[in-house]
C-alpha cells in the first residue's frame, strides 16, 4: 500500500475513533481552535483558550480547553493531516515527519520547492540525540533549546528518508512555546514544521494572516497574536545555525535571535564562525 493510502486510512480510523468527520470528497473539514474574543467567531468555528504559559490549574476550564486542543491536534497529525500551530516566533504548519504523503501535502499547499528543507520539531532536548548525531556539548543544546533557534546537525537513520532527501542534515526546533512542547511530547514522534504562509509571502503572526490556507488544512490552532507585530524582528523567524562541523558554527539565517545565539556559541563555548553548509 502506498504511503498516501496508508495516511488516508490512518486518518479515517483516527477520525472515527474521536468523533471527527471528513468533509465532502476532495475537501478537508477545517476546524478552528481559538481563544475567546469579543469579536464574532467565524461560522462553525470552535473556540478554545490556549494559555500562553500553560500554567493553569489541572481541573480548570482553561486546562480542559488546552487538553482538548492537544488531543484534536494529535489525532489529526497521527492521521497524516496538516495542522496550523502557534510557535514562539511565527505561526507554523506541522505534520508527522514519518508520513511521506503529509510531507508532500505541506509542499503542495505552500507552493514550496521540494528542494527546500522542512525543520523537525521535538518536545525535549533529550529527543535530539535520537534523531541527530550531536557533536556539541549537551549544555550548548540546553542553552539554546527551547528557544527561537533552529539547530542544524547531521541526521540519524531514525528520520523518514523522504524528509529532505537531498541533504544529510536536518534542522531541529524546540519552540519556547508550551503548547508546541506539549504537542510534540504527546505526539511521541518528530513533527515536520514550516511557516504558515505561501512561499515568497510574508510570515504569519496571527491566524487571519494565513486564512487563505484554512480550506487546505485539517485543523487550525489559534494561540492569539505572536509578538507585537510592529518590530522589524517580529517576522524574521528562528535563527538557523549549522552545528554539523565540530568546533564551528555557520549562520544560515540571521532570524530573530542572532546576537544572543552567537554570543553563546562564541563566548561560552568557543565555537568559531564558518560558512553555512545547509541548503
UniProtKB/Swiss-Prot annotation:
Transit peptide: 1-55
Function: Cytoplasmic and mitochondrial threonylcarbamoyl-AMP synthase required for the formation of a threonylcarbamoyl group on adenosine at position 37 (t(6)A37) in tRNAs that read codons beginning with adenine. Catalyzes the conversion of L-threonine, HCO(3)(-)/CO(2) and ATP to give threonylcarbamoyl-AMP (TC-AMP) as the acyladenylate intermediate, with the release of diphosphate. Participates in t(6)A37 formation in cytoplasmic and mitochondrial tRNAs. May regulate the activity of some transporters.
Organism of provenance: Homo sapiens
Catalytic reaction equation(s): L-threonine + hydrogencarbonate + ATP = L-threonylcarbamoyladenylate + diphosphate + H2O
Gene Ontology CC terms: cytoplasm; mitochondrion; plasma membrane
Coiled coil: none
Keyword Mitochondrion part of the UniProt annotation: yes
Record family assignment: Belongs to the SUA5 family.
NCBIfam families reported for this sequence: L-threonylcarbamoyladenylate synthase (TIGR00057)
Record-given protein name: Threonylcarbamoyl-AMP synthase
Listed GO MF terms: double-stranded RNA binding; L-threonylcarbamoyladenylate synthase; nucleotidyltransferase activity; tRNA binding
Tissue: Ubiquitously expressed.
Region feature (Disordered): 21-41
